[in-house]
Regions:
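Active-site glycine-centered loops adjacent to acidic/histidine catalytic or metal-binding residues
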Residues: 110, 135, 157, 208, ...
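Gly/Ser/Thr-rich phosphate-binding loop
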Residues: 75-80, 89-152, 164
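Conserved ATP/PPi-binding loop(s) of AMP-dependent carboxylate-activating enzymes
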Residues: 158-162, 170-201, 233-235
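Conserved AMP-binding/adenylation subdomain of ANL enzymes
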Residues: 12-29, 37-77, 91
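Short beta-strand->loop structural element characteristic of the AMP-binding/adenylate-forming
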Residues: 3-5, 32, 54-60, 131
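AMP-binding/adenylate-forming catalytic core of the ANL superfamily
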Residues: 78, 183, 189, 209-255
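Conserved AMP-binding A3 loop
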Residues: 1-16
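Glycine-centered tight turns that cap/initiate beta-strands
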Residues: 102, 162, 249-252
Length: 255
């Protein structure tokens, strides 16, 4: 494990970015069924404190409790991991999902958010949006994605304001390669290390594989270390998982 020193300036930068991009305000009631020991939950806490909204901390991610809390506290935003949101939308009793309909925002963070879950959430919300962001503890909230385009439903979005992202590979082209990030959201070095092998000229080497489309939207294809070479062909496990996951009768898949 590596220690990641988080600076005040990087927290301030990321917090202001998410507040501006997703229009958080003092009028929001933010439901947070996430541990504050993780950067996702802690980042949501920072955002609520920054805008002066009401924050409801929930000690578990039980789907029934989440739905009850939304109704009880008139929550306007919900932050949860993809697996929790998938469990909520898989509820066979559609009427029980009514509390979700009044949310203005559902936010998650993940390299992969199942498209079927996104579609179900969007169908339930009246006027609200579903969003995600991509980032690491070392480079928080590097991209943002608001799911309003079916063609981009598997993307993690465009680079956040003030953040640079590039694709680095052996050919020095921008097709598929390791995702490098640069910006105020990126750490200087790991704990007790003057030099980091993960940094190059202020760029953070994330270890994630990705590509940009023609519109500048980023797609995550997996991890550099997970890349499989079959008869000279590069195979990305996450691409296999995405294809198999949409087949009927498949609930979970690991490649």
């Amino acid at each position: 494990p590596k220690g990641v020193p988080i600076t005040h300036s990087s927290c301030d930068f990321s917090t202001k970015n998410i507040a501006k991009t997703l229009q958080y305000s003092k009028n929001d009631v933010d439901l947070l069924p996430l541990p504050l020991s993780h950067s996702f939950g802690l980042g949501c806490l920072h955002t609520s404190l920054y805008v002066g909204s009401t924050l409801v901390l929930q000690k578990n991610s039980n789907t029934t409790d989440i739905l009850n809390s939304i109704k009880k506290y008139n929550a306007t935003t919900l932050a949860a991991i993809p697996s929790t949101l998938s469990k909520i939308t898989s509820n066979s009793h559609t009427d029980s999902l009514d509390p979700l309909s009044n949310l203005r925002l559902i936010i998650t963070n993940s390299t992969f958010f199942p498209p079927e879950t996104i579609r179900k959430l969007k169908s339930i919300l009246k006027t609200g949006i579903v969003a995600t962001y991509y980032g690491l503890t070392e480079a928080s909230r590097s991209t943002f994605m608001i799911f309003d385009d079916e063609e981009k439903i598997e993307s993690v979005g465009r680079p956040s304001e003030g953040v640079q992202i590039k694709i680095q590979n052996e050919n020095n082209d921008d097709k598929i390669g390791e995702i490098w990030v640069k910006g105020q959201n990126v750490i200087n070095n790991y704990w007790k290390k003057e030099y980091s092998e993960n940094k190059s000229d202020e760029w953070l080497k994330t270890g994630d594989l990705g590509r940009f489309d023609d519109d500048g939207f980023l797609y995550i294809l997996g991890r550099v270390d997970d890349l499989i070479n079959i008869s000279g062909e590069k195979v990305y496990p996450q691409e296999i998982e995405r294809i198999v996951k949409v087949l009927s009768g498949i609930d979970e898949v690991v490649a």
